[in-house]
């Protein structure tokens, strides 16, 4: 028999995520979370030891979602659209857990465990990008050496990781809405353009036009 999810625990995680995203994790205390939920701090501490415990549980969910987003196709050769889809899923995950990226350095300095787990995610992202790009080379979509693919994967991972922080310092774009994720995805995809064969570069341009409408 499957155990029922604990509603209070789920509410704490849901509300914490919303507050962290809106206000920034350093600006939210467990008392703030308890007040928002209209529960006592003692009730919150029954489910989570402290705020860092809440952050770790949210990170677990982020990590699982990110792992799913980075899965490469297994039963066929990769296509250009696969990278686009992967990036879309990754950017959606980044947006859903955006507090992790906004406060990334602070969080990783505070927790060695999170630092190690985030490093694993970056390693997994690099490997996934290399795998898909190598497949695109084999099918004639990309023209790039192994060294170029490694550098491309590094640049894609770096741009994706810090895209949200970059956007936040642009004065004209201080209000973020989910449809604007398309702009970030487009910028990352343009890193591929110099390595695409002519026909595939036109294909990328058509994909971009459809996506940014």
Cite the ranges covered by each PLM segment.
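Short, basic, alpha-helical segments at the C-terminal edge of helix-turn-helix-like DNA-binding modules
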Residues: 60-66
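Hydrophobic alpha-helical connector segments
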Residues: 71-99
């Amino acid at each position: 028999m499957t155990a029922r999810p604990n509603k209070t625990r789920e509410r704490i995680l849901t509300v914490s995520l919303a507050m962290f995203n809106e206000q920034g994790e350093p600006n939210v205390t467990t008392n703030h979370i308890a007040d928002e939920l209209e529960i006592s701090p003692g009730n919150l501490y029954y489910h989570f030891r402290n705020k860092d415990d809440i952050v770790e549980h949210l990170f677990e969910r982020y990590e699982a979602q990110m792992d799913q987003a980075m899965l490469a196709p297994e039963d066929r050769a990769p296509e250009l659209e696969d990278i686009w889809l992967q990036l879309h899923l990754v950017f959606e995950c980044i947006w859903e857990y955006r507090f992790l990226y906004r406060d990334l350095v602070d969080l990783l300095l505070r927790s060695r465990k999170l630092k190690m787990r985030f490093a694993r995610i970056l390693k997994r992202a690099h490997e996934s990008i290399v795998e898909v790009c190598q497949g695109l080379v084999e099918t004639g979509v990309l023209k790039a050496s192994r060294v170029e693919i490694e550098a491309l994967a590094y640049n894609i991972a770096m741009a994706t990781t810090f895209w949200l922080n970059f956007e936040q310092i642009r004065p004209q774009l201080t209000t973020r809405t989910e449809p604007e994720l398309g702009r970030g995805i487009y910028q990352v995809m343009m890193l591929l353009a110099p390595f695409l064969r002519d026909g595939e570069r036109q294909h990328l341009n058509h994909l971009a036009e459809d996506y940014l409408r």
